[in-house]
C-alpha cells in the first residue's frame, strides 16, 4: 500500500563495537532508548518494495520538487526514507557529518531492513552537501549503491567532521554515481580529480558532468532544454539504482 507519512527510526545504542570502514550495518544488539531516534519522512511504493533508498537532504523542509522526485522514486518501486539530519540541537547549517551522520544513516538502514529490505538493496542519495554525506556513507558502509548530485568538499573538507572526498574516494565500498554541473562549489578540475580518485576504489564509479546548472532532480528547469537535462539526470539516477540494487 503506497503512502507518505512521518515516522521515527531508533538510533542504535552506543556500545563498544567495531565502527571501522569494513563494518557492515547490522541490527542493534539491544533496543534503543525511546528518546534516541531520527525523525523520518517515508514514501512507500505501490505493492512490494524492490529495495530501499535513504535520501539525505540539506533542507529542514521539503520543497515541492523534492517531494515530487521522491514520489517518482517510489513509483519505480523503491521504499524512500528521508531522515531529518538536523534533529540534534547541535546540528550545523553546514550539514551533518562524522559519527552523527553514520548514526542517522544506520538508524534508517535498520528501519528499512526491519521492513524486509535486504541490506544489499539499500542505496543512498544526496544533493549538494547531502551529496557529500552520501559519498562519505559509501566510504564507511558496504551498502548497495550511492549517488551524489553536486557534492562539494572535493579537495578540502566542508567541516572538521567531514573528510575531503578525494582523500577517501579509494575507500568507496558501494558503486557510486556522481552528477555535477557548473556550480562554483564543484570546479571542473576538482571533479576530474575526484573521478580519478574514485577509479582507484574496488567498486564501480561513474562521474557525469553537465554543461549547465539545471541538471538536478530537486531543481527542475523552466524550458525545454532544461527539461532535457533534467530527464537525463533522472534517468541516470534510476538506472544506477536499477543496475546495482538487486
Model-derived regions, located:
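N-terminal cap/leader regions of alpha/beta-hydrolase-fold enzymes
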Residues: 1-246
Amino acid at each position: 500500500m503506497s503512502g507518505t507519512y512521518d515516522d521515527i527510526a531508533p538510533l542504535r545504542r552506543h556500545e563498544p563495537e567495531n565502527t571501522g570502514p569494513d563494518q557492515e550495518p547490522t541490527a542493534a544488539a539491544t533496543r534503543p532508548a525511546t528518546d534516541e531516534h531520527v525523525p523520518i519522512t517515508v514514501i512507500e511504493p505501490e505493492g512490494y518494495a524492490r529495495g530501499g533508498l535513504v535520501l539525505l537532504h540539506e533542507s529542514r523542509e521539503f520543497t515541492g520538487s523534492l517531494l515530487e522526485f521522491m514520489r517518482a522514486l517510489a513509483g519505480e518501486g523503491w521504499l524512500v526514507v528521508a531522515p531529518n539530519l538536523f534533529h540534534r540541537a547541535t546540528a550545523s547549517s553546514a550539514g551533518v557529518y562524522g559519527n552523527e551522520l553514520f548514526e542517522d544513516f544506520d538508524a534508517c538502514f535498520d528501519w528499512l531492513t526491519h521492513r524486509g529490505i535486504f541490506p544489499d538493496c539499500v542505496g543512498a542519495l544526496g544533493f549538494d552537501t547531502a551529496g557529500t554525506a552520501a559519498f562519505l556513507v559509501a566510504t564507511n558502509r558496504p551498502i548497495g549503491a550511492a549517488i551524489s548530485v553536486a557534492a562539494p568538499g572535493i579537495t578540502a573538507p566542508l567541516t572538521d567532521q567531514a573528510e575531503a572526498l578525494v582523500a577517501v574516494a579509494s575507500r568507496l565500498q558501494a558503486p557510486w554515481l556522481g552528477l555535477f554541473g557548473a556550480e562554483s562549489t564543484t570546479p571542473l578540475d576538482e571533479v576530474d580529480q575526484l573521478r580519478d580518485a574514485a577509479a582507484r576504489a574496488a567498486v564501480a564509479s561513474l562521474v557525469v558532468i553537465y554543461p549547465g546548472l539545471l541538471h538536478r532532480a530537486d531543481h527542475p528547469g523552466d524550458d525545454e532544454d532544461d527539461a532535457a537535462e533534467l530527464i537525463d539526470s533522472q534517468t541516470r539516477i534510476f538506472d544506477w539504482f536499477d543496475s546495482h540494487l538487486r
